[in-house]
């Protein structure tokens, strides 16, 4: 019998399992963590497994863009999940940061799969240590820069506050894009602006168009290293129901893909995709869309590295 008797454990897109080796340009990093404090929707810690599972439906070639085996061109690997305990950020965050540093030090771009939005902080810290002058492009329906209580600093509403205050990113050139919906308190946008962030609400984004908006961001950052944080609740719950904090009036799947493709040319050095919560998902919709967005990001990375056409 020619076919192997056993299948390997499930990895994203069936990638080889392990740490990046020579020539690897991308390393998928599962971050099965949530703070466990949402009053209604807990479960993003199961996001990495769900996204990997739904990635079985993603094909490796895109005949309209490059027509190449992009994961193979990137020599991408799935590093597995960071060994952490959900609900304990003070213990988990240094381990997440160390895991991301191991990918960065191997010369690869870490692609984090969360996990709730809090995972972005240790990943940004790692990227900021290796890429001075890091700026963030935060695609989300929420700003996630609420005031941080010194006694309980880490939660999925404060990661960009902490990143700005800790110097992991330069908030003066970092943008929140896609912001919409109701909030628990007043003054949310004023706080973002006081920290230095540019806020692009979803109505402005759609009115100006993705290309023009991202071109303005690219001109502002001037080739500086970019951390891409993609919160899946930027999508409308109609296409991504299984997220931690859904907000109506979001992007369609087609719009999200178009926005991702508009990022071509940015110097993205690390990224994460967060907030998939399988317990609230319907038929794997949010997890499957997240898997597709990661595949789109890999295509974007291959293009930036000049690998398309090399296969």
Task: Name every feature range the model reports, one short phrase each.
Residues 2-311:
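Conserved alpha-helical scaffold segments that buttress catalytic/binding sites
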